[in-house]
Every structure is written in C-alpha cells, then in structure tokens.
A protein has these predicted regions:
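Short, charged, solvent-exposed linker or helix-capping segments at domain edges/interfaces
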Residues: 17, 59-62, 105, 213-216, ...
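C-terminal beta-strand edge segments of enzyme domains
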Residues: 129-131, 194-277
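CN hydrolase (nitrilase-like) catalytic-core segments centered on the catalytic cysteine
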Residues: 61-79, 146-233
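Active-site catalytic loop in hydrolytic enzyme cores
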Residues: 85-157, 166, 172-180, 187, ...
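Cys-nucleophile CN-hydrolase/nitrilase-fold catalytic domain and related Cys-dependent amidase chemistry
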Residues: 13, 17-21, 25-100, 106, ...
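Residue-level signal for short segments within beta-strands and strand-turn junctions
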Residues: 9, 98, 206-208
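Extreme N-terminal starter segment of soluble prokaryotic enzymes
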Residues: 1-7
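Structural motif
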Residues: 37-38, 137, 161
C-alpha cells in the first residue's frame, strides 16, 4: 500500500479565508489528479498567520464545510490549518479531513511559541492520532517538532505517519531533527512550509534507514528548495514501513521507562530560564 502525501509549499494571505479556501480547493484538485491520498498545508493556511485575530474572528468547524464537501467530491483528504476558536483565546489548529468529507480529528498546537507573539494563543493539551483510510496519522504543528516528546507520544498512540504543518525559517537543523524523529520512532514524517528566502524546504522522511543487509539508505523522500511555490509529493510504502517496524529496535521496543521520571518535571533550571511577559 502506497500512502501518497501532497505537500503544499506556499504562503497564504492574512484574513482572507475565502480566497485561501479557493487556493486550497485548487490544490486539492491537483493533488487528486496526481493520485495523492491527502493534501498537507503549511501552518495557519486558511486564516494566515495573523496573531491579531481574536477568538470571535477565528474560524470554527462550520467554516470548513466547503473544504469537507470538496474532499468528499474528489475523494482526497486534507490537513486544513487555521487559527480557530478556543475556550477563551484562539488556537493554532489542524483538522484532518477524510476522503468522505468527515472531520476525523482536530489538533491544537501544544507547544505555542510563548517566547514570541504566539503567547497570546491558547495551547492545546494533548497529542492526537486518527485513522485515515487505514493509516494512523498524528499531527505536530511547527514548534511542536522542536520537542522529541511530541513525536514520541504520537508513536506511543499508534501513529505510523506524522504530518507537520509548519511556518518558519532557518530550516537546516529542523530538517535534521525531522529525519531523526522519523528514525527514532519508526514513523514516516512529512512537513509543509511556506516558500520564501531562508524558508521552504518542505520535506518528507521514511523511517527506513537501512536495508535488509544493514546497509544505510537515504531516508529522504522529499526535500524541496526554499523559494519554489506549489505542490510536492511524497510516497510512503506502508507495507515496507510496517515490516520494518515489526523487526527493528527503535520506537517502543526496548525503552527503559522507569528511568524517565525526570521528563515529567516542570522545573526550569539555568540556562533555560526565560522571562515570561
């Protein structure tokens, strides 16, 4: 079974939900023509990454109706991203829409960038996994991927593929980290980032890092340049990935969880203390 992800590398417009939705539908159609199973958008694509949006102006699930209808019509999935209504403040969220137009999952970004303007958002409280057409999908949004715990929890919850809506620059260390997340969790990873100078580099990595003869293989399935806008594709061989996961020693095979209690401490020590504004 091949699970094909269409990765959109493009920047959307701020506060232009209708126009951005038309762009999404255009690329959903192109993704379907190219036999993709799902279209992955960059972070906050529907609304734009406009942190002046208040909770009243943020979108809700009802605003996804046209995209759900198009997903059903085309038979292609979508990871839709937007600033959405939270309990008191907006959330940075992703919705996984299935091929029949159903919303399979909403995930709100847990690791909001509290060192920057994103501190005004309401963070999510859990990592989530859903079943998409027989493939277990987890979501990390941008800064989530800087914390290995994010991908590890998704793996523990059964994720086989982790999709990453993203919006940032200086991508080289982030690419290395995403490849490592794929390797250490034995999960496929795909990331969509807006194009631009020092940006872009949308990517995908297989968890398969060596062959049956223990020879290293390049696990890069996709690595876009910085400035090209448009769709890129990554094909995950789920049969090969599942066989690899059944025999190799990463993931949840030999963890020593009794030694991990310090991971649950919320104490922050030097040199990691920061002022909280």
């Amino acid at each position: 079974m091949i699970f094909k992800v269409a990765v959109l590398q493009m920047r959307s417009e701020n506060r232009a939900v209708e126009e951005n939705s038309k762009t999404i539908i255009k690329y959903m159609t192109e993704a379907k023509i190219n036999n993709a199973d799902i279209l992955l958008l960059p972070e906050c694509f529907m609304t734009g990454y406009d942190l002046t949006i208040n909770n009243d102006a943020a979108i809700s699930e009802s605003d996804l109706a046209s995209l759900c209808d198009k997903a059903k019509e085309l038979g292609v999935g979508l990871v839709a991203t937007a600033l959405t209504k939270g309990n008191a403040k907006p959330q940075n969220a992703a919705f996984v829409i299935g091929k029949h137009g159903e919303i399979l999952m909403k995930y709100a970004k847990v690791h909001t960038c509290d060192f920057a303007d994103e501190r005004v958002l309401e963070p999510g409280t859990e990592f989530r996994v859903c079943d998409f057409d027989g493939v277990k999908i987890g979501i990390m949004i941008c800064y989530d991927r800087e914390y290995p715990e994010s991908a590890r929890i998704l793996m523990l919850k059964g994720a086989e593929i982790i999709l990453v809506p993203n919006d940032c620059v200086s991508m080289r260390p982030r690419l290395q980290a995403l490849s490592t997340r794929a390797y250490e969790n034995m999960c496929g990873v795909a990331m969509a980032n807006p194009n631009g100078k020092n940006a872009g580099n949308s990517c995908a990595y297989s968890p398969i890092c060596w062959d049956d003869n223990d020879e290293c293989v390049d696990n890069t399935l996709l690595l876009a340049d910085a400035e090209t806008a448009g769709l890129f594709y990554a094909a995950f061989d789920m049969g090969a990935i599942r066989q690899y996961r059944e025999r190799e020693m990463m993931g949840n095979t030999f963890r020593k969880v009794k030694a991990y209690s310090d991971l649950l401490s919320d104490e922050i020590q030097y040199p990691f203390k920061r002022s909280r504004k």
